């Protein structure tokens, strides 16, 4: 318990309007689902540099509340594996709570799920802007990669924060651990 208290764990979240490595991530996932993905030399460094240098749109930084003594004491009362899981879960909740959802996230969620669930969060111009951006990004990938698989993963990259926030709300409402 004392060790965790000494750490003074303060969860943070950074939310980007535009994921700078969206198409690289989608491409890698599509390839890795078909066969073992082998990164080219320097690919990791290139991804890091893209993540730093590429456009991100608006950025939201949230510095969460530190883990409480009660949360740490609760975790400390568990066996070693459960202790770390409880701490991880408490940190995850704070990170997700602090995550800002952007219009792109809601647009992608609705497109991916063929719904209008979050249509009050954006307008038609936002949809057109996101779809145009997505199609442009998809056009940068070699044509032999399945475009529909690529599109689905691309949409999921932007939609998943909405799904995660929904799970957080369900978890708060039910008390069941979903995350």
Feature names for model-found ranges:
Residues 1-179:
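Membrane-interfacial terminal anchoring regions of lipid-handling membrane enzymes
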């Amino acid at each position: 318990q004392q060790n965790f208290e000494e750490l003074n764990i303060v969860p943070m979240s950074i939310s980007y309007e535009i994921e700078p490595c969206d198409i690289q991530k989608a491409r890698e996932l599509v390839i890795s689902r078909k066969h073992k993905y082998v990164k080219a030399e320097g690919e990791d460094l290139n991804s890091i540099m893209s993540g730093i240098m590429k456009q991100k749109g608006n950025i939201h930084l949230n510095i969460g509340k530190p883990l409480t003594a009660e949360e740490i004491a609760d975790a400390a009362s568990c066996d070693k594996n459960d202790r770390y899981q409880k701490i991880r879960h408490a940190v995850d909740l704070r990170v997700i709570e602090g995550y800002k959802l952007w219009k792109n996230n809601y647009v992608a969620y609705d497109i991916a799920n063929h719904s209008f669930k979050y249509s009050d969060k954006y307008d038609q111009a936002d949809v057109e802007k996101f779809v145009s951006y997505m199609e442009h990004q998809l056009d940068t990938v070699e044509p032999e990669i399945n475009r529909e698989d690529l599109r689905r993963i691309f949409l999921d990259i932007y939609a998943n924060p909405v799904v995660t926030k929904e799970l957080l709300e369900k978890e708060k409402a039910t008390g069941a651990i979903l995350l």
